[in-house]
Amino acid sequence: GLKQRVTALNAFLSDVYSEGQILKDHVIPAELVYTASNFQREVHGVKVPLGVYTHIVGSDLIRDDQGQYMVLEDNLRSPSGVSYLLANRQAMTRIYPGVFDRQGVRTVGHYTTQLLALLSSLSPRAPQATVVVLTPGMYNSAYFEHAFLAQQMGVELVEGRDLFVDNGRVCMRTTSGR
């Protein structure tokens, strides 16, 4: 289900930002893609690491009146919301120990460990990669998400101004400024 969906979304992005066969075949109107607010012309022809455009997707699921799950939307740009689930589960587990186990609810405690492993694996410096969570800042609506994930993964929470490029590598500023 969802794995195949993410694979299909990545295949779509790969095609749109390279040959554009899906547009040439008129499966999707080219104007619809090229006028979309999130379409980035400058990405056309860019070779992304491992050929994957998005590693983390937020698929919003709903259940219809027949009890069947359906995807309401896919958020590839900035998927958020998992931190609220994780924080809620931590709180509920402390308040009601054992209730999730008795109900057969699967654990989600491994999420941030797996997320960190995924992000680390994407670096050419893996397994010695430095992972950070990049945030627009504390006034962003997803700031709690960014701060929570950084804290849970044990990584730095940084803003754009905390980073600089040195000899083709992205570096994090220190308290001394560089």
Q: What positions do the PLM features span?
A:
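Domain-scale recognition of functional cores that engage charged ligands
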Residues: G1-R178
